[in-house]
């Protein structure tokens, strides 16, 4: 193990001892906010320190086994113990590398999922509907709640644009790699010649902010318009102006919300989406400034980038970022996304490990 890594782990070990002392202090237990902060830190570093102490014990065991090598009667046993100990060290070191990876502070958050039809006209809108169904089914499998915030339905079905809130622990960690361009290749139902058409949609996954107040939005920088909500082709027309459109002048971001039961609820939802988009824009700008040349393609979340192709005639889905092709398009589009999501997460983790190795 690299000296820099050992030094970092030793510091964490000392910190855990300090936290244990603090947690037994009445001054800490009587201060609820401080107590929660300390218990959270304690929970975060305990598994790391436990692995490090197991690593140190394995080193001791290897030294004791090597000391027995000089004894002819114990030599074979000592060799076996030494090899087993070295394998254990390797396994623990790999586990420690993963535990030390920087955690995304947004991983546990709820998300706003935005899907917009792109090139391809009606077929693109239908594909947007298929994507929303896929994510909704996946969310159901996870036990998450899906709530449509705003939907602009197409007259042939599907959506020109749909925004949904997905509530569930770890929603962002699972779906954050879905941001980008999604392309579909299939024969439309209206195609009489059997020709394959290509259409596209863009997906954006935004972590929900804790409070709208966490993002600075100057009231003078926004315009709020109200209008009558309607479904596809003017269906379900409300008699009151309950739909809300918010325009944020500094960023040019426009948010519409019309699926709530009242103007008040629509405005609250629209402000939440606006805050999430502004926050995401700020994070994108910060990352752009500090991005290194080997910035992870998976983690970039560039919405203009084509990330995946859904080829229906061949029954395949290809994720271009990791060159993964799966011939199970029906299962995946019905929400069986685990293999795809886990592969993306594993690649991202490998990329972070490579970065950690360079930093060390």
Curated annotation (Swiss-Prot):
Localisation: Cytoplasm
InterPro entries in UniProt: PCRF, Pep_chain_release_fac_I, Pep_chain_release_fac_I_sf, Prokaryotic/Mito_RF, RF-1
GO CC terms in record: cytoplasm
Membrane found in the keyword field: no
Any Pfam family hit: RF-1
Domain of life, per lineage: Bacteria
This protein's record includes keyword Manganese: no
Gene3D superfamilies reported in the protein's UniProt record: 3.30.160.20, 3.30.70.1660, 6.10.140.1950
Predominant subcellular localization, coarse grouping: cytoplasm
Keyword list, A-Z: Cytoplasm, Methylation, Protein biosynthesis
Disulfide bonds: none
Post-translational modification: Methylated by PrmC. Methylation increases the termination efficiency of RF1.
GO molecular function, one term: translation release factor activity, codon specific
Entry-annotated residues carrying N5-methylglutamine: 235
Chain's role: Peptide chain release factor 1 directs the termination of translation in response to the peptide chain termination codons UAG and UAA.
Family: Belongs to the prokaryotic/mitochondrial release factor family.
Protein name: Peptide chain release factor 1
């Amino acid at each position: 193990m690299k000296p820099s890594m050992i030094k970092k782990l030793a510091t964490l070990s000392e910190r855990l001892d300090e936290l244990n002392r603090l947690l037994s202090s009445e001054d800490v237990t009587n201060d609820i906010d401080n107590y929660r902060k300390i218990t959270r830190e304690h929970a975060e570093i305990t598994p790391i320190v436990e692995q490090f102490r197991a690593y140190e014990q394995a080193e001791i065991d290897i030294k004791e086994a090597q000391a027995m090598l000089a004894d002819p009667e114990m030599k074979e046993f000592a060799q076996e113990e030494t090899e087993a100990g070295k394998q254990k060290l390797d396994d623990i070191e790999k586990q420690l590398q993963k535990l030390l990876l920087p955690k995304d502070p947004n991983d546990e958050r709820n998300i706003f999922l935005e899907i917009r039809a792109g090139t391809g006209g009606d077929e693109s809108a239908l594909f947007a509907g298929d994507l929303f169904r896929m994510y909704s089914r996946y969310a159901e499998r996870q036990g998450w709640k899906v709530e449509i915030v705003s939907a602009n339905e197409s007259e042939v079905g599907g959506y020109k644009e749909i925004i949904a809130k997905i509530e569930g622990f770890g929603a962002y960690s699972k779906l954050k790699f879905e941001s980008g361009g999604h392309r579909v290749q299939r024969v439309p139902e209206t195609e009489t010649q059997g020709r394959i058409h290509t259409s596209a949609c863009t997906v954006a996954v935004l972590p929900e902010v804790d409070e709208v107040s966490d993002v600075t939005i100057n009231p003078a920088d926004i315009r709020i318009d109200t209008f009558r909500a309607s479904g596809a082709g003017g269906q379900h027309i409300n008699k009151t102006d309950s739909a809300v459109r918010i325009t944020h002048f500094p960023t040019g971001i426009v948010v519409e919300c019309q699926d709530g039961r009242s103007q008040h609820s629509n405005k609250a939802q629209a402000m939440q989406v606006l805050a999430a988009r502004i926050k995401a824009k700020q994070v994108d700008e910060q990352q752009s400034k500090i991005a290194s040349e080997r910035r992870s393609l998976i983690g970039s979340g560039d919405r203009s980038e084509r990330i995946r192709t859904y080829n229906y005639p061949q029954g395949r889905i290809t994720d271009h970022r990791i060159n993964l092709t799966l011939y199970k398009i029906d299962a995946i589009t019905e929400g069986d996304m685990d293999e795809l999501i886990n592969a993306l997460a594993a690649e991202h983790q490998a990329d972070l490990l490579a970065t950690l190795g360079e930093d060390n």
